Amino acid sequence: MKLQLVYVLISSESDFFLEEFWVSLFSLRRFHPKDKVVVLTDHPTAERVRDRPQLTSMITDLKIIDLPDDYDGRLRSRTLKTSVRNLIDGDFLTIDTDTVICGSLDEVDNLPVKNMGMVPEMH
């Protein structure tokens, strides 16, 4: 793929977002073993990711973003998700952590979309 594949991950011991992400990334790597995967995250989540070498080995670039300490997980996630364009250079495809990839995404590179494309909720 020409596009960078980008995830936003904020997780703590009290949720399953890291586990959901792992399933999503594992499914992505079945079809895109060598493509660039960037994960935008905060410091606490990055530590949890780094504690899992098998997971870390599937990530090309773990970008740790400084966020205010008083932000809860939801606000941290929303802040990163709405800032992706300012944090990633070049073209990218954002993948939600609860997405299971069931086939190649190569055709996304050829979509006739100039600046933005999206999938409707509950598709």
Q: Which residue stretches match the model-derived regions?
A:
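The conserved acidic donor/metal-binding loop of glycosyltransferases
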Residues: 96-100
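A short, glycine-/small-residue-rich helix N-cap motif at loop->alpha-helix starts
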Residues: 17, 70-79
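N-terminal anchoring/stem segment of glycosyltransferases
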Residues: 1-69
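Conserved donor-nucleotide/metal-binding helix-loop-beta segment in metal-dependent transferases, i.e.
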Residues: 101-123
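Short, conserved acidic/polar surface loops in the N-terminal third of protein domains
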Residues: 49-51, 74-77, 103-106
